[in-house]
């Protein structure tokens, strides 16, 4: 059986022209990077809900996030899980950082490849509570589009009017990296000239924390939050849940060079 090969007429170079971050260390790339260089940790005791009955009581959560700072109105915010809001905020920063001009003429050559490992746990828990308390009529009509993983990529395209490929691959903890790779391949094979890529997560909820605790995956080093994440250490005892988003703008080199990106 012969191996199938896809012909690429001319190998296209790909560059990063924009970066956006929403992390436990900062609400933008600059603050996050400065904190990393200073050796700071974003892992702290969980204050989002009562964790007294959980073996793991720490996480790396985003702090002081305000959706309105990223042109997400309260009305729209009620339609989106936090992972969508984090990712959209990071995309706003990345696209601004890239100084990307989006027009009717180029919108079909600009796409999105952004995913989430788990998706909308907070939204799922909230609507399950509504169901239990008031029956199915109390469930938000925006529950499904506000919780499923592909809607972050969808919301980015909606915000900017992007008409290129729209991808949302889910591969657990490698989701962000996987989408970056697929976005790059999309440009390489000529299906787009620009791709907004990355991942977003918000899994620090009772269900998320409880689920990972049940499979004994999390560190219980609650008294040493900043020292809990140590994957290659002999004394490691699990990982730490982390929330936030990281978005890149990938661009075909000649295009980026032409516009002095």
State the predicted function of each range:
Residues 21, 80, 169:
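Generic anion/oxyanion-binding catalytic loop in active/binding sites
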Residues 2-57, 61-70:
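Generic N-terminal targeting/processing segments that precede catalytic cores or assembly contacts
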Residues 2-11, 27, 38-46, 77, ...:
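Acyl-thioester C-C bond-transforming condensing/cleaving domain
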Residues 48-101, 149-163:
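A glycine- and small-residue-enriched flexible loop/hinge segment at structural boundaries
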Residues 28-31, 35, 83-90, 175, ...:
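Generic hydrophobic secondary-structure packing signal
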